[in-house]
Amino acid sequence: MKKIYWQLLPLLLFSVQLIARNTDSAWIRINQLGYTPNGVKVAVYGSKGSMSIPQFSLIDSATGKKLLVRSAGKAMGAYGPFNQTHRLDFSSFTKPGTYYLQAGKARSPYFRIGKDVYNGAADFCLRYMRQQRSGFNPFLKDSCHMYDGYTLYGPMPDSTFVPVTGGWHDASDYLQYSTTSANATAHLLMAYRDFPSVFKDTYAANGLPGNNGIADVLDEAKWGLDWLLKMHPKDDWMFNQIADDRDHSGMRIPKLDSQYGRGYERPVYFITGEPQVRGRFMNNTTGTSSTAGKFAGAFAIASGIYRNIDKDYSELMQYKAGSAWRFALRKPGVTQTASVKSPYIYAEDNWVDDMEFAAATLQRKEDALRYAAQEPVTPWLGEDTAKHYQWYPFINLGHYELARMLKGEEKKNVISYYHTGIRKVWEKANRNAFYRAIPYIWCSNNLTASFAIQCYWYRQLTGDKQFSALEQANFDWLFGCNPWGTSMVYGLPVHGDTPVDPHAAFTHIMKAPIDGGLVDGPVYGSIYNNLIGIQLFNPDQYAPFQSQLAVYHDDYGDYSTNEPTMDGTASLVYLLAAFQWSAGK
């Protein structure tokens, strides 16, 4: 027996060495866009082994010289695929240049520090918005969905034609929702209003290359506004969506969309304030407020912006804002979307936030304060889960618009609502190295971008920087400081690790890029394992970084994590504009 043991010992030792070598695999995750000289600069070290590291180095990429050696700080423990993690904080280093980090045998990709690292990123994401246009599509240089659409649920006879061509396709399908489109339009308008110097004019209003004296972001916002006008053509008419989940029967280019048995016409659903079809069930619509409130807010902001650009359009926007406000009051409650084949819908459950947003932008201070008090904190903040788009638009835009018009104690009180929500997230986030406490539900990246905006707004309104590291961590997550080490935006940065095989017809059928599209992002392993119709078409290059906690695939077959969305991208446009503007101050 002893003889056999000694014969096996070298093999056993070799096996132990192999195990150690495998479990000691480690990576450093960074924001691939880079960092600003005076901003928070943190990378995350993640290891398959359990040993902590004492320090890390910042190294000049050109000379190989160590310019900074810092303590790796306390070990943060296991997270997702990693057994040990550290936050590598190099915020004190401010010299512009190109660098990499080294910690043990782990080495980060190159990254830049500079005031200009975010320049042009917001405009880059507008490429995806233009590509999502319905009607004339400038990317295709062709038209689609010119026969929208025939009515359902309206006061007019079913199948009445209404001209509603325009707007944006919601995602890689070609559905068009008023709720997401109004929210996207509002974000683009606010981005122009708050950071006008960030945006360039290199495209015409129709989305083709050229210029027209108008910033491209405002051209894109107006594309959304003009469609919202079609969806609210009369004071007592408002439509909720074009098309439904019959769209999901297969990928195709937009102009070949004929899924509804009526040639190229698509259904247009009227907002009734009553439940409508949801697969074999009915949705939980209770009123008209959530979608109409978003319309009112977008129109009101547009009225202010266009006052010195196009007076007639400004007056039209002001009138429509009031009209949408009144429509929202017809039956206080939430408007959910409709589906025919499956139960998957945008199951929005809150509406007072939308009414606060509408009231604040319409300068209805007392109404806005009343609605704000009814839902001071967006309900998902600090929670582990939520239904798909249950608390939309993920943060309360109304608090920001209201705080901008208030003073004194009223202003402090509204700002405290943001503080409370951020604190709920922070109490969970500070337990892991990624400062991650966003639920891994569908469109987790959209929640991430929105939460980063809330942190930014809180900092701007107060000057309080206590949550700056949390804000930056959520921003960094979207560009590679995550377990997978990938940016979640197609093509950004240009030479980075970004999605290349998204769930999108343009890339899958046409082999065309979808520059600037923010993909849905990781989901809980439990969600991924229970979704219908997911099948990976290629080996998983991120297999070492998958876990039961969260899954992400850069694979056409994974519609749950790798499908870009129009509204998430519009939110990201605002966030990127904010970061570029802040870096240049």
Where are these regions (language model features)?
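Bacterial Sec-dependent N-terminal signal peptides
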Residues: 1-23
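Short, compositionally biased P/S/T/A/G/V-rich stretches that sit at domain boundaries
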Residues: 21-33
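Aromatic (Trp/Tyr) and acidic
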Residues: 32-109, 115, 130-186, 191, ...
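Acidic, glycine-anchored loop motifs typical of Ca2+
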Residues: 206-214
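Active-site-adjacent structural elements in folded domains
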Residues: 278-283, 338-346, 381-386, 433-441, ...
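Aromatic-lined, polymer-binding surfaces characteristic
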Residues: 292, 296-306, 314-366, 375, ...
